[in-house]
Structures are given as structure tokens and as C-alpha cells.
Amino acid sequence: MFMINIACLIVPILLAMAFLTLVERKTLGYMQLRKGPNIVGPHGLLQPFADAVKLFTKEPLRPLTSSKLLFMVAPTLALTLALTMWAPLPMPYSLISLNLGLLFILAISSLAVYSILWSGWASNSKYALIGAIRAVAQTVSYEVTLAIILLSILLMSGSFTLTNLITTQEQMWLIIPAWPLAMMWFISTLAETNRAPFDLTEGESELVSGFNVEYAAGPFALFFLAEYANIMMMNALTTLLFLGAHHTPLVPEAYTANFVLKTLMLTATFLWIRASYPRFRYDQLMHLLWKNFLPITLAMLMWHVSLPMSLASIPPQT
């Protein structure tokens, strides 16, 4: 029975990832005054399935000098971790009910760094290794601010439980009192998922394709799926933290529809940003975090710690 529950969670996510690739290609196409994929199926709707068949039926080549085990383990680990992160998300019911749901998500997203590092190192290619090192430095750096922002939000809700966050936001979305945190969180999630304008790991001009340069066929598809699963996961988490997730007092039945709609709007913003902005320079990326975001988030954390204490309204601790 539990396996059926897992399948009911994973299959829709995989389908959503497939169509997200199509939406992205269509969006970029129309923003660049062209059509995008429109041959396979009506209006190109079957393009993701054609891509999947093509990738998974090709021969998975690997470099002769690569580390065989790590080379194959890395993409599998990437997708496994990307899908595991969805388990504690209330939509409106989660697969597993965790008291420390947010901490679990943060820990799993930290582990995802290893799949990137292993893939770059196991490929035995200097392009892949430089791309992997960039990705690790970027991800680890931005996780610092993500963790501090999470802590500030948790001080408002008083619990690590994700369902408590929804209860906290019944009267007001947290994006209103904590809008500077929300802005920094959104930009940090862009960097965390290696998306434009922070996609330095796959800088075509200098790194060919980044850490996955030596991958082809199935393993490449797994990395691709993991990236899009992480994008949707981060947007779902943003919805839970700042946009009140599902609660509409007049229509409580529209829980899941609300949640999905807000997540899709944030995902569309990700695609819009990709179509609009050029890539950052690497030193600018690090400067933005360590010299701008980190001091501001620390100041906001002190503010969120001192405010409840000064007003004698410490949030309920569960």
C-alpha cells in the first residue's frame, strides 16, 4: 500500500517535469519571436515523450578514463534526492508527517551537492570538474542565506512543521510582513537550482555544458529531470513559506488547486527570468551573496528574534 502512495506522489511529479520542459521551450520560443517545438503531436504536446524515448533508447556512452561506479551513481542520486524532498510537503496531506519537515528538506537539498560533485569528478574531464566545483561553491554559499531566512520565518510560526506554517498564514500571508526575506529567498532559490541568471555551472561559452558535459542518453535525462524537480520543489516551498499555500477562507475546498496555481505562477516567473536576463559573472554572484544578502538576512534574523520578545508575544512552540 505504501508503494502505491509513493507512486501516486512520484508519477504526477514526473509528468509535471516532462511538461515543464515543453512549457519552458515554448515560453523561450515565443519570447524570442519563434514557435518552439510544434511538430510532435498537436501543437508539440507530445514532444516531452518523444524526447524521453529518444534519450532512454540511446546507448549510454561514458569516457574510457571515467570512474565507472560514481559516473552512474551520480545521476541516480540526483533524481532520487530531488523526488525525496517532496515527501513532507502538505498538498494538503503529506506522504510522511515530519515534525522537522523544513529541516529535512534543507538537509536533502544539501546532499544534492554530492551528486554534482561526483558527476564532475567521475567524468575525468576538466570542463566537468570546473563546472562541478562552481556548482558546489554556489549551492553551499546560497544555502547559508536559505537557512537563515528559514530560521527567521520559523520564529514567526513557532514550529518546523509545514502544516503549522499554513495555520500561521490563515489571516495574512507571510510575504507581507517579511517581504525583504521573500525577495532574497526567491533569488537564492534561483541560485540554489542553478537557473538563469545564475547558471554559471553550464556556461556554454567557457565550460561547454558544465558538470554534465560527458553524459549522454539516460543518465543525462536523469540530471535533466532532477533539475526540473528541484525547480518545482523550491517553488512549492516558496508557496508554503510566503504565499499561505492553500488557504482561502471562503473556499477551503480549493486547497490543492490554490497550491498548484501559486506554484505554477512562481515557476512561470523562473522561466520568464531565464528568457529576460543575461548570466552573472562569477565574482558578482559571490559578491551578491556574501556582501549583500548575508548581512541583510542576519539583520532580519535579529529583528525577528527581538520583535516577539519585545512585544511579549513569543510564538507557540511545538
Swiss-Prot record:
GO terms for biological process: aerobic respiration. It is a multi-pass membrane protein. GO terms for molecular function: NADH dehydrogenase (ubiquinone) activity. Keywords: Electron transport, Membrane, Mitochondrion, Mitochondrion inner membrane, NAD, Respiratory chain, Translocase, Transmembrane, Transmembrane helix, Transport, Ubiquinone. InterPro entries: NADH_UbQ_OxRdtase_su1/FPO, NADH_UbQ_OxRdtase_su1_CS. It catalyses: a ubiquinone + NADH + 5 H(+)(in) = a ubiquinol + NAD(+) + 4 H(+)(out). It is an enzyme of class 7 (translocase). The chain crosses the membrane at residues 2-22, 69-89, 100-120, 146-166, 172-192, 222-242, 253-273, 294-314. Belongs to the complex I subunit 1 family. This is NADH-ubiquinone oxidoreductase chain 1. It comes from Tamandua tetradactyla (Southern anteater). The lineage of its organism: Eukaryota, Metazoa, Chordata, Craniata, Vertebrata.
